[in-house]
C-alpha cells in the first residue's frame, strides 16, 4: 500500500532537529465511533473520519483515540465535526483467509488531541 500526502507547506528542518510525525485533520465522523476497553484495561475508540476535499470528494481516514479522548469519542455520533491531531502509524496484524493466515499492515492516525468543532 502506498500512502500519499498532499502538503500545503513544506519547511527544511535544521540538521539537528528531531524528525516529526504530526498530522492535523478537520473532518466528520462517518459512523458512530466504537469505544472499548482492551484486555490490558486501556480505553480506545476506533473512529473513521471523513475529511472533505474540493469537488465533493472526501478522504476516509481511520483513527484511534486513547483514554479521555476515547471516552469523549464514544459519546459522539455520526456526522460530528471534529479537529484531531496525532501521528500516522502502521501496525501489523494477521488476517485469516480460508485456511491461510496472511500478514497485513494497517495505517491509521493515533490521536493525542481531539476537539469538537462547534459551528
Language model features with spans:
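Single-stranded nucleic acid-binding surfaces, predominantly the OB-fold ssDNA-binding core
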Residues: 2-119
Amino acid at each position: 500500500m502506498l500512502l500519499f500526502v498532499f502538503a500545503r507547506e513544506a519547511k527544511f528542518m535544521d540538521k539537528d532537529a528531531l524528525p516529526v510525525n504530526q498530522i492535523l485533520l478537520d473532518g466528520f465522523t462517518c459512523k458512530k465511533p466504537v469505544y472499548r476497553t482492551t484486555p490490558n484495561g486501556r480505553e480506545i475508540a476506533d473512529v473513521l473520519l471523513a475529511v472533505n476535499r474540493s469537488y465533493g470528494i472526501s478522504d476516509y481516514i481511520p483513527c484511534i483515540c486513547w483514554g479521555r479522548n476515547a471516552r469523549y469519542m464514544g459519546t459522539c455520533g455520526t456526522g460530528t465535526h471534529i479537529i484531531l491531531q496525532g501521528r500516522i502509524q502502521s501496525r501489523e496484524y494477521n488476517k485469516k483467509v480460508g485456511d491461510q493466515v496472511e500478514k497485513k499492515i494497517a495505517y491509521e492516525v493515533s490521536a493525542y488531541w481531539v476537539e469538537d468543532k462547534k459551528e
